[in-house]
């Protein structure tokens, strides 16, 4: 599983280094160094703006997700299903890190996520996300506002 946060940079050509522990998880837990980069679910900042980042799925996980979306396992209305396909499936790009662990983030996805020099890689279990550092600071603040206040529910999760 992907866990932890790593602060890294992206160069002028759009290349960034995937944290070594994430590369290791790709190979040891998912059996493949290939992965898919796509748009992450936007975070509503409650002020009319949204935080946009990227989600990275091991290839096998992505293929399973793609099957579920195509089969409409969420039973979404057609308009929502088509929006989901355009927002998640459409921009998805299969990638592989080079021998130095670097990956080229496709230009359209860099623009979408407003990626500047500093990036956060954030482990999310069976995927990881990539955020511009400024956006990630706002995402964290929003997450704190959204954090469940029900102590019994948190205790049941072991938190």
UniProtKB/Swiss-Prot annotation:
Record domain SpoVT-AbrB: where: 5-61, 92-135
One example GO MF annotation: transcription cis-regulatory region binding
Keyword Endoplasmic reticulum found: no
Record bears the keyword Cell inner membrane: no
Domain of life: Bacteria
Gene3D superfamilies: Transcriptional regulator MraZ domain (3.40.1550.20)
Any Pfam family hit: MraZ
PANTHER family: TRANSCRIPTIONAL REGULATOR MRAZ
Summary of subunit composition and partner proteins: Forms oligomers.
Family recorded in the similarity comment: Belongs to the MraZ family.
NCBIfam families per UniProt: PRK00326.3-4
Name this protein carries in UniProt: Transcriptional regulator MraZ
Species in which this protein is naturally found: Trichlorobacter lovleyi (strain ATCC BAA-1151 / DSM 17278 / SZ)
Lineage, highest ranks first: Bacteria, Pseudomonadati, Thermodesulfobacteriota, Desulfuromonadia, Geobacterales
Name of the coding gene: mraZ
């Amino acid at each position: 599983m992907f866990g932890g946060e790593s602060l890294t940079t992206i160069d002028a050509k759009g290349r960034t280094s995937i944290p070594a522990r994430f590369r290791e998880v790709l190979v040891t837990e998912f059996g493949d160094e290939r992965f898919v980069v796509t748009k992450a679910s936007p975070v509503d900042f409650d002020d009319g703006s949204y935080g946009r980042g990227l989600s990275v799925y091991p290839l096998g996980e992505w293929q399973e997700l793609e099957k579920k979306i195509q089969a409409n396992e969420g039973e979404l209305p057609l308009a929502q299903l088509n929006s989901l396909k355009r927002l998640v499936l459409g921009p998805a790009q299969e990638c592989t890190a080079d021998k130095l662990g670097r990956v080229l983030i496709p230009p359209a996805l860099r623009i979408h996520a407003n990626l500047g020099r500093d990036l956060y890689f954030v482990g999310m279990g069976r995927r990881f996300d990539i955020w511009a550092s400024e956006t990630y600071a706002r995402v964290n603040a929003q997450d704190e506002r959204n954090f469940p206040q029900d102590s019994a529910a948190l205790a049941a999760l072991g938190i």
